[in-house]
């Protein structure tokens, strides 16, 4: 379901009460090859103050690295980036006309409940409405992008003059949504509304975040298996386009980085590191040694 899209693309959020001292969180791997080493860490993109400080093994690995690789660097978004997002996110009359009739009233109610203008439904593409609605829902729960783990690591790296590189671009990430057939976009939005209305989406956020916050390998692996076995369209889209199709190019870039530099660190969304088509699995397939630390 699209609630899984929420988890993957908007960062595996949920409710959490955590102690304010460093503990193991997420998923951590050590990758060796080409005579070099890389630390690979699973993150979430919006966070709470309770997520910090990070485990000392993470901060030490970053301090020892010459480069930090992220999906994108969230600290350097520009006005040009915002303009590009606006250009690609605006809808067309044909897309609006394809909205399922029953979806319109539900979408209007949700927008109004959030204090957003109902006119957004005829201004933004379905996938951008999905992002907007879910981001606002997470914000209501206290989650903030400036407290995302990626942003935290990027700030630390910049402060220590460690090079930060992006494995992807904002444009490429938005393109994953924008290339979806219009009917699929409306289906994803429909399922997102249903999961938020029922509370199921929020519960799944909690499950993923608890797994991340406790570095609960069994729970995270169980979630990955659950998503992989779900036959619904949105889960298939998630597995194919938002994970598998991205993981291949990212694995190639990480392999190249490992070959070039002695000590590096990569931090990407948690869901990229679990499941059968995960980055660790792809890196192993390249002949690299991949060890799970936790």
List each language-model region with its residue ranges:
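A cross-kingdom marker for long, charged
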Residues: 236-294
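Sec/Tat signal peptide C-region and signal peptidase I cleavage site
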Residues: 18-22
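Bacterial N-terminal signal peptides
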Residues: 7-17
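Alpha-helical transmembrane segments and their juxtamembrane interfaces
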Residues: 13-14, 53, 279
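Residues in and immediately flanking transmembrane alpha helices
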Residues: 16-17, 56, 282
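Positively charged n-region of N-terminal signal peptides that target proteins for export
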Residues: 1-5
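Structured, acidic catalytic/metal-binding patches in enzyme active sites
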Residues: 23-238, 242
């Amino acid at each position: 379901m699209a609630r899984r899209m929420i988890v993957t693309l908007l960062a595996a959020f949920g409710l959490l009460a955590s102690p304010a001292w460093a503990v193991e969180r997420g998923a951590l791997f050590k990758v060796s090859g080409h005579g070099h080493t890389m630390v690979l860490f699973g993150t979430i993109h919006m966070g709470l103050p309770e997520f910090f400080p990070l485990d000392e093994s993470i901060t030490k690995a970053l301090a020892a690295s010459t480069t930090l690789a992220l999906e994108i660097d969230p600290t350097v978004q520009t006005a040009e980036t915002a303009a590009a997002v606006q250009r690609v996110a605006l809808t067309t009359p044909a897309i609006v006309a394809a909205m399922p009739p029953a979806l319109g009233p539900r979408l209007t109610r949700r927008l109004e409940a959030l204090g957003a203008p109902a006119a957004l439904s005829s201004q933004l593409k379905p996938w951008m409405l999905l992002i907007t609605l879910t981001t606002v829902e997470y914000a209501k729960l206290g989650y903030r992008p400036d407290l995302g783990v990626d942003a935290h690591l990027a700030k630390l790296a910049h402060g220590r003059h460690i090079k930060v590189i992006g494995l992807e671009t904002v444009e490429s990430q938005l393109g994953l949504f924008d290339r979806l057939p219009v009917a699929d976009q409306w289906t994803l939005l429909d399922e997102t509304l249903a999961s938020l209305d029922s509370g199921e989406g929020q519960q799944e956020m909690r499950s993923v975040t608890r797994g991340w916050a406790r570095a609960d390998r069994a729970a995270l692996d169980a979630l990955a298996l659950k998503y992989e076995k779900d036959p619904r369209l949105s889960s298939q889209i998630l597995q194919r386009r938002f994970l598998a199709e991205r993981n291949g190019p990212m694995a190639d870039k990480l392999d190249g980085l490992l070959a070039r530099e002695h000590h590096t660190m990569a931090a990407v969304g948690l869901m990229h590191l679990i499941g059968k088509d995960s980055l660790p699995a792809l890196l192993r397939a390249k002949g690299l040694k991949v060890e799970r630390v936790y």
